[in-house]
């Protein structure tokens, strides 16, 4: 059967299906859009099946009709002839399977609006594991009405209450495992950064210090709150298991091994070592390794970003990041001065207390009279009152320094890290766009080469036969010479040319298919950044900065208000003493 007959039979099958097929395809598209965050595995399987069944070349009227279908950019697999013969039966099977899923599961947006998950990380506690090694665990308190979390939890819903409060303890390794799982499942989503592991702390023994633990506590709490505010990450099943108090979390963590690229893991069953890799991790690591080199080798015309919205977002992120870094430097210097002042006032208070002790000791040795004793006791009391006020002043400076160092500065650093995370996602989109432009250049080059080879495929010229050349033998000889000299026919002396043309045609087909796939990926990623990831980050960042600044203002107000009240009381006592001396 020729290719024309194959595509004609496909056209007849589509004509027989008529509008019913279009309705079914539209239903399947709705399912795909609604369940894109919950049924990723099923979508990949359906897309692969559809890709293997869709013909490579479609008539013009079919292209117009398929613009609204979800398979508009699908390509023909290598076994296209076999799949084309079964396209009708497979498509019908796909639609029959897809139709019952219409009302099974609501979309992630509707679940985000209907249900809420509020998680707070508090109460760090030092504990020992099975091997008697110390670690810090953090208390997760979850208030939610989400059915998935309630189903996994052992806490039962009370009558008259819509929200269930669930508590569970997690250590830093659990947060790291959650981060790795979400990164692998959603590589196109902005992932909130975790606090650094700070391996050097293990060398100095400061991993269990109050300062280090509180800083990590605030960062982990911010990490979880970002996930709860995200429409995709908050609906992830692994996150629901993480916040629940189910005993399956430890089992799931032990059994699921997230492989890393370039790391050898021993296979106990086979008795040898094998290189394990994950597709997403492999792609990300390869991008990180080759990004600098490829960008250096790529022509400068491909490095320019043309999307105005992406440019505006990048410019805003850059300016905000620079401002946050400046604020961090300013408050770090200011906080260091606060710490120095607290130490100075503490030393000043100790010296005043020593003066009161010296005054009492000198009075006891001189044996003064009764009026003198009362006056000297009042002097010692005044020294103690002034020393206590200085000590109160020092404690307030110390508390303010502690809040700025463990909470406010950590929030500024975390906001800067979140900007870097979103910038990395934009950089990934830009690199994908560069790859697409390079593929387009390769396609244009291949087409020009094919056109150059195809230009020689012309009919042989008609030989000129005259009667002056000496008869029919000479004319026949001249005809053969002219025919052999042209070498323009596709059947004589053109096997090498045919091989080149075939290779170029196959290369062009592969490039066109890859460009169609990459174009859709770049378009989806760009729309996701502009319409979802950036607005979600912007909302979260505004809330975090507002809460941080409000917390700093409250601490400053309480600090100065306490100083005013304390020094006002001290001032009244000292003025009263001056009046008595007069």
Swiss-Prot record:
It is a peripheral membrane protein. Residues 300-329, 494-529 form a coiled coil. Its main location: cytoplasm. PROSITE patterns: PX (PS50195). The keyword Cytoplasm applies. It is found in: Cytoplasm, Cytosol; Preautophagosomal structure membrane; Endosome membrane. Residues 116-249 form the PX domain. Residues 57-70 have a biased composition (Acidic residues). This is Sorting nexin-4. It comes from Debaryomyces hansenii (strain ATCC 36239 / CBS 767 / BCRC 21394 / JCM 1990 / NBRC 0083 / IGC 2968). The lineage of its organism: Eukaryota, Fungi, Dikarya, Ascomycota, Saccharomycotina. The gene is SNX4.
